[in-house]
């Protein structure tokens, strides 16, 4: 694996390092800023892996830092090293809050202690913050004088010697609850005519565990991970609602999406893709029986991530048109529609409509929400706090446009299309509670603590929201 890990400033000069093996020269990191500078002169795109004299420099950039791992073997697992570097930054963020050059210089003692624990002889070891915080705190350690105290001080925490290393024993809560959120983020690229060019669903199952003892949880989703949904003319997206239940009971009380009301609709089977589980999940149980069983860490964590590449109808749709007037002004008309079921409501909707860089003196008319001109983004921001399904709202904006000028013949020089005026796509943000786009549903969330046998309260919530790229291309 890695022979050494370095923290370098924005120029590539080392701030702090930890060598795990002696198979690289001490001067190896001195070549990194030179290699970095040479690549920056050649191109703006710098690969995350550099090679020099048989050494591989694998690095990530975070704020004003480069976190670098140097390896000697070409057969090293690059993906594992990059995963470790990202996890290392995550651990440091939990300790230092902000990982940047100044915080590295101010907390080198703590960082060295962490580097000794997260990796041993170049092989990743403990990367769970909750485990590390059991015996590495931000306070300085006092010198231990007696040999007996030294033996006790070097003894590993109980969690490290347990089969469940991510959860220590003896956890107690006054009220035993487990909160499960299924959050689906929609990335979509659409044309102005409504054609979907690209769409995907990024799912994240988040858990907040407030359970005593060593509970064993069993999570069941519809049809063991391969589930069905029904398509009709109104929408191709089934909704879901948040539910609560007592211990060992089903958490989904609403009718199944395979009910008789869907008999005349088209049935489509959907299978989760790119599944990624937290280490607490028993993978063999899932592979054999498609049941998710786990002993959760205490507090918040991501239980599962998944992706679906499937064509879906736009949830929030906008039709943007531009009219150019002869007096150096343009008028922008936008109609927005919530293409979701009427019982669902989109919240915190934000529609960012691009305008020319030299636009000025805006005036607005709108039916709902609020409008704001954002000159630093050359855009108009339309905010709608509540957008019920099936509703359609409209707005219009009139702006001055000095770039519309007379040509040599005395005629106005007019842009030929919306794309020539509104450079850039329309960006949309939204959130729809109690709603899933893919159709995934929790059938049950059972909690069992064999020793304490307490009453527990599982809670399930569904949220669909826009992803990082939900845009309408104006071409």
From Swiss-Prot:
Region (Disordered): 240-262
Stored Gene3D superfamilies: 3.30.450.60, Mu homology domain, subdomain B
A GO term from the CC aspect: clathrin-coated pit
Annotated keywords: Coated pit, Cytoplasmic vesicle, Membrane, Protein transport, Transport
GO biological process: Golgi to vacuole transport; intracellular protein transport; vesicle targeting, trans-Golgi to endosome; vesicle-mediated transport
Membrane topology: Peripheral membrane protein
InterPro entries according to UniProt: Adaptor_comp_med_subunit (IPR050431), AP2_Mu_C_sf (IPR036168), AP_mu_sigma_su (IPR022775), Clathrin_mu (IPR001392), Clathrin_mu_CS (IPR018240), Longin-like_dom_sf (IPR011012), MHD (IPR028565)
Cited PROSITE patterns: CLAT_ADAPTOR_M_1 (PS00990), CLAT_ADAPTOR_M_2 (PS00991), MHD (PS51072)
Keyword Protein biosynthesis listed: no
Keyword Transport listed: yes
Residue ranges of every copy of the MHD domain listed in the record: 175-473
GO molecular function terms listed in the Swiss-Prot or TrEMBL record: clathrin adaptor activity
Compartment annotation: Cytoplasmic vesicle; Cytoplasmic vesicle, Clathrin-coated vesicle membrane; Membrane, Clathrin-coated pit
Family stated for the protein in its record: Belongs to the adaptor complexes medium subunit family.
Matches recorded under PANTHER family: AP COMPLEX SUBUNIT MU
Something else known: Present with 4420 molecules/cell in log phase SD medium.
Subunit structure: Adaptor protein complex 1 (AP-1) is a heterotetramer composed of two large adaptins (gamma-type subunit APL4 and beta-type subunit APL2), a medium adaptin (mu-type subunit APM1) and a small adaptin (sigma-type subunit APS1). AP-1 interacts with clathrin.
Function: Component of the adaptor complexes which link clathrin to receptors in coated vesicles. Clathrin-associated protein complexes are believed to interact with the cytoplasmic tails of membrane proteins, leading to their selection and concentration. The AP-1 complex interacts directly with clathrin. AP57 is probably a subunit of the Golgi membrane adaptor.
Protein name as it appears in the record: AP-1 complex subunit mu-1-I
